[in-house]
Amino acid sequence: MFLWGQSDTLWTADIIGEVSTGSEYRTSADSLATDVESASDYLQKDSRFNLKQYTPGSVVASSFGGASSEQSRVLWDGIDISSMATGVLDLSLVPAMMLSTTSIVDGINGGASSNMGSMGALNLNLSPKSGRGTTTAIGLTSIGERTLNAHSWGSFSNIRYQSIVRFTSSENEYDYRIGTLEGRMVGNGYGDLTYLQRFSGSMGKTYWSSDLWYTQSEKNNSGSILSPGYINHLEDEVVRFKYKLKRGHNELKLFASQEWQAYTDTMSSWTLRDTNTFGQFTAHYTRTEKLYHAHLSLNRYTAGGMNRTATVWMPQVQLNLKPSQAWNTVLKAAQYHNHVYWSAYALYSHSKTPWLQQWSVGSYYRLPTLNEMYWNPGGNVGVSAERSYGAKYSLEHEGKWTIRFTSDQLYYDQMIQWAPGSDGNWTPQNYYSVYTSTTYLGVQRKIWQQKHAFNTTHQYSRILDVASNNSNIIGKQLIYRPALQAVYTIEQELPVGTLMLRGYYTGLRHTLRDNARTGDLPAQSWVDLAYSLSSKSKRWQWVFRIENITGAQRQFYQYYPMPGRTYLLNIKLHS
């Protein structure tokens, strides 16, 4: 069915409630994977997700289209929690159980859902639970990963609660082969701990909820297979708190977070330790009426540590108008670093069973981060915000065949890029003008006793202008953007259990800005096989999965090989 705003809470941008986002198909193996995997691992089954990862469990740079990772935003119950220090959020530290089947808002529609995004958004939320229960999930892999996830829920004194503890640890050692290079990857171990706690209830006609999200992680990186193998160490600790009150037409959300990060660099004769902090406070008020939704928010971002010290305030006003059943518009204004930024978005829908068509246009901004403005040395307080202008078309069909087609066309101006400055230091500059085109096709169909799900994304980019003497990159494509990604899933019900076969394809990617062939990552494809079995009462479930059954060569960064054939066992107990 068409899913228009399937969420248990009000989003920051209610226009998303009118956007058709499509629905992810989850196999039996996928359902258990959400209790064990991180969001970055789980989202690889969606071709709209662009992943850059050194090794399993490493820091992830990701996006949902667009021209850079900073342009795609991550929301938590409508609050933009993407770091305003770095501009991104490491999805390897996000539990997959915070993803719903409609979490991804693709294209320029995602820009309407966040404070400063322009292409794609991911909305995280903890699904509500009824009754009382406890689940324990355990995951084991052949490369040394061990995962434990404990989830309990219930109520006391008319207060609902959910508690989640997730622990992951891995030696992350495996053999590799890239071309004629062979060896064993070592020194990339990692571990993380996540604690989520929710309380919710009602006081008269007022609904309230409070959420605490704590994460602590440590990751090692031994560098590429061409490096000497010095091990760098990253420590990260973050606590997030969100409180919500909702009564009638009014809603208030308060969000606060504090992150501490330490990076130890040993890839030279010197051992360097860099420690930094980042904080965010957001107060968000929403007034909901039949023809409009009004939003007022106040954001405070702070950064401290060895490389930058800064505090920036960002008040924002947003008005969502619904003049008719077919039309929706969003108007936004924000003040950031003594500048006022405007953006606008419009959506038109036409529905005639079994078809749904939507057209949308929008103009957005991507604000410079605190690192880009204040990093020492190299920060540029004068760097301008990126601007984007885009259009989107969506077509959906619901019947025996479920089909979703989307096409996004965007022009980006003043894209920010770190480049050598006049003093020799690397500094952020408004470097590019870029055109991007992203086309997505998703198809689902049940044939006999098999369920088939196919999704593919085609991306095209072209650098139109560059603010430097480096004119040889004009006309070139952006780096690390595969022209084509595709995922095909078949699920077969067996007399006992369920079998899943899933194939992946990632096209050629450029890693050099001049698109020289010496830096190209060739197209890669691999296949996963999974068998799942559960009791009739669903009291237990287990999945045995073989990833990359053919041992295909894979790498998301050049000379950082991913594992070959890997075995995984996931077990879930429910009481």
Predicted regions and their residues:
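Gram-negative outer-membrane beta-barrel transporters
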Residues: 321-328, 409-411, 430-512
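Short acidic/polar hinge/loop motifs at secondary-structure boundaries
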Residues: 79-107, 124
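Conserved C-terminal beta-signal and adjacent last beta-strands/turns
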Residues: 153, 159, 164, 189, ...
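N-terminal periplasmic accessory domains that precede
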Residues: 35-43, 60-63, 89-95, 115-137, ...
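Periplasmic-side early beta-strands and strand-to-turn transitions of outer-membrane beta-barrels
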Residues: 131, 155-234
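Outer-membrane beta-barrel signature, preferentially recognizing the C-terminal barrel domain
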Residues: 227-229, 233-242, 274, 351-413, ...
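Short strand-turn segments of transmembrane beta-barrel domains in outer membranes
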Residues: 101-106, 111, 121, 127-154, ...
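Extracytoplasmic beta-strand/coil segments of soluble accessory domains associated
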Residues: 41-80
